[in-house]
Amino acid sequence: MKMASQRFCLRWNNHQSNLLSVFDQLLHAETFTDVTLAVEGQHLKAHKMVLSACSPYFNTLFVSHPEKHPIVILKDVPYSDMKSLLDFMYRGEVSVDQERLTAFLRVAESLRIKGLTEVNDDKPSPAAAAAGAGATGSESTATTPQLQRIQPYLVPQRNRSQAGGLLASAANAGNTPTLPVQPSLLSSALMPKRKRGRPRKLSGSSNGTGNDYDDFDRENMMNDSSDLGNGKMCNESYSGNDDGSDDNQPNAGHTDDLNESRDSLPSKRSKNSKDHRVVSHHEDNSTSVTPTKATPELSQRLFGSSSTTISATAPGGSSTGPSETISLLEISDERESAPVHLPTILGLKIRAINTTTPAQQGSPQTPTKSKPKIRQATGSNNSNSLLKQQLRGGAKDPEVPPATRITGAVTPNAALNAEEQSKEMPKKNQDEVNACIGLHSLANAAEQQAAQVASTGNLHHQLLLHMAANNSMLNTTDYYQQQQQESPSSAGQFMDDDLELLSLNDQQDKSDEPDHEMVTLADENAGLPGYQGNEAEATPAQEDSPAAETATAPPPAPRSGKKGAKRPIQRRRVRRKAQSTLDDQAEHLTEMSVRGLDLFRYASVVEGVYRCTECAKENMQKTFKNKYSFQRHAFLYHEGKHRKVFPCPVCSKEFSRPDKMKNHLKMTHENFTPPKDIGAFSPLKYLISAAAAGDMHATIYQQQQDHYHRQLAEQLEQQNASFDSRDSSLILPDVKMEHAEDQDAEQEAELSDGGYDASNPAAAAAAMLSLQQDVIIKDEIQISPSPSPTPPASCAVAEGKSLALASTAQTAT
């Protein structure tokens, strides 16, 4: 019996992405284009196959008109919208401004663009919900593309709070992990798109054989509770590739979620996605920590807290029925078992140098343990506190027990644990505990106000003003300077007024923390290894020493040992205004200085997005991803009146740098100053006034006239000499002598007056004509680096002498 030969399925995973990129390249190169779209007097070339695949309208049009290269004239369609639609059809994504979104979707609906107007039967399309279309698609196996990069502040605040309330009720009741229905289709339209580590699923390409992975993923998206929540918003106002993420779950099975955490930085507006993801992992072997009320996550970002009342689920995945309250110290241990990567508020990167030891993850800590143990258990929470980023001069990583990390006075058990914990702490730590409790209550009050007022910038400013008013909870120096205090090399280099305000208590805090995170701007990319503290170096005398807050506190002595050898020597710039509240709005703008200019006065930072306040005064909303883009904008558009300019001494053209001005002199004016003369450079060497130029012209003209007058006088002398030689034979000797004397006197008079013979006007006229032909007066001014030479004394014309052609009458002989 003959056995059937085996068949092998060869599949290229990048086939779909390759087709996408190739079609896009062909569009930009205008290769193989077979249709022209005429819009607003302009034309766009495209491929009929792509347009037909993405729009039933174009498909019907091309089938009914089978021309080789048709020209489609689209009336009442803006050119920019049609170009954006082409980008969407070829790439599957497009960026649209908020004010143009409605008109753009209306055009897409009129042209019946797939992914923007249609809704599948099994799953609502977010983009179609935003467009308001109610039609259903015929292709049930194809996943519809989603809109990306739409500004997330289109979602109203009330929708956010309602969705959070539904989530909280579902979590408390112990329901199935499926998500509640969103209160509005617009919110589902603007939910972030899920990114995966595989090619994007294309519409119309499913054949039942090669898309098993895609079908499984799509089915998983419908059954899993992380349907709309596992995504990230590809927002143009945020920078990606940040290591900070909110994927805390240690389950190795969800590799897609772990991969996507490095794709983009989540914003405050994607709060629902984080809540959905926490609810979805009921099958994990770790305790799920779920918030039970819908509040914005300001307190979570500031204090490293993720819950107020905690509901626990069994490891098997089944709910325990009524939500039971876990002790606060158990929550601390649970948080230490999984490293928490909190998202940053202002776009700064946080990197943990080392993690906690496994011995601290086993049994829960009790409130009766010694203070170093409590401090060691709360190291992770201290490192996750974003007060060191958010508040300059605030509580720099204070020693706060776990009771203060979670919203107090919510659960009676939590309040009792907080009181018992506070009794065990010394007096110097009690002040810091009270300070952080006050800050946390302030954050809760601010969150309630934020639910009513949509402006998060006002909330931010109110928090900072409250911090400035209560100096009792603030230390006098910022976290950035305290990092420098640990260095043995820099301890003696930055001894200024700000560093003298460092307290011994802060130094002890830094030395006792087993894990410490880098949040300074200067070192966010450096990866220096010497920032973790050494607990063995802490002595009981240092622990019990009071905090010296006076300006006369001596600087701490430089440390020795392995830590000094491990940390490299690094000089960093220290900000002098440590207690200033005006520039507390964004600490990550510490280094925003271009040539000494304060560019921060033009900026307002809201959730990591830089907005130009100067342009906002003119009703122009300009936002920037990072501070370097804003620096360029502020320097070019708003600092032009204040920056120093270097004008060209010849044409007065302004330059921003002196070397550009000198290069302009060399190239344009054909002039170059040697390097040795740069210090003594004077523009007067290169400028000739109009009066001096007129004097030069007059002097040259007079010199040339005098020269020709002398030549004419010599010719007249020769003629007179020939006449005298002929007449001398007819005159008596005594008369000849007398006539010669008279002739000499007349010659001297003629020479002294510089005149011509009055009896010969024709000669004088001819001489004048020759003078006008030979003398050419140039209108150009010759500029040279050296002073103009003075005319020789022999050619100088005495002042007061006239150049008359005939001044005296000569008697006829």
From Swiss-Prot:
Residues 33-98 form the BTB domain. Signal peptide: none annotated. Residues 176-187, 302-324, 356-369, 377-388 have a biased composition (Polar residues). The modification Phosphoserine is found at S203, S205, S206, S682. It comes from the Eukaryota. Residues 125-145 have a biased composition (Low complexity). CDD domains: BTB_POZ_BAB-like. SMART domains: BTB, ZnF_C2H2. One of its GO terms (cellular component) is polytene chromosome. Residues 254-285 have a biased composition (Basic and acidic residues). A zinc finger (C2H2-type) spans 610-638, 646-669. GO terms for molecular function: DNA binding; DNA-binding transcription repressor activity, RNA polymerase II-specific; POZ domain binding; protein homodimerization activity; RNA polymerase II cis-regulatory region sequence-specific DNA binding; zinc ion binding. Gene3D superfamilies: Classic Zinc Finger (3.30.160.60), Potassium Channel Kv1.1, Chain A (3.30.710.10). SUPFAM superfamilies: beta-beta-alpha zinc fingers (SSF57667), POZ domain (SSF54695). Residues 192-201, 560-578 have a biased composition (Basic residues). Interacts with CoRest/CG33525, suggesting that it acts by recruiting a CoRest-containing corepressor complex. Interacts with phyl. Binds to a number of sites in the transcriptional regulatory region of ftz. Isoform alpha is required to repress genes that promote the R7 cell fate. Probable repressor of the transcription of the segmentation genes ftz, eve, h, odd, run, and en. May bind to the region 5'-AGGG[CT]GG-3'. Degradation of ttk is directed by binding of sinah or sina, via the adapter molecule phyl which binds to the BTB domain of ttk. PANTHER family: BTB DOMAIN TRANSCRIPTION FACTOR (PTHR23110), PROTEIN TRAMTRACK, ALPHA ISOFORM (PTHR23110:SF82). This is Protein tramtrack, alpha isoform. The gene is ttk.
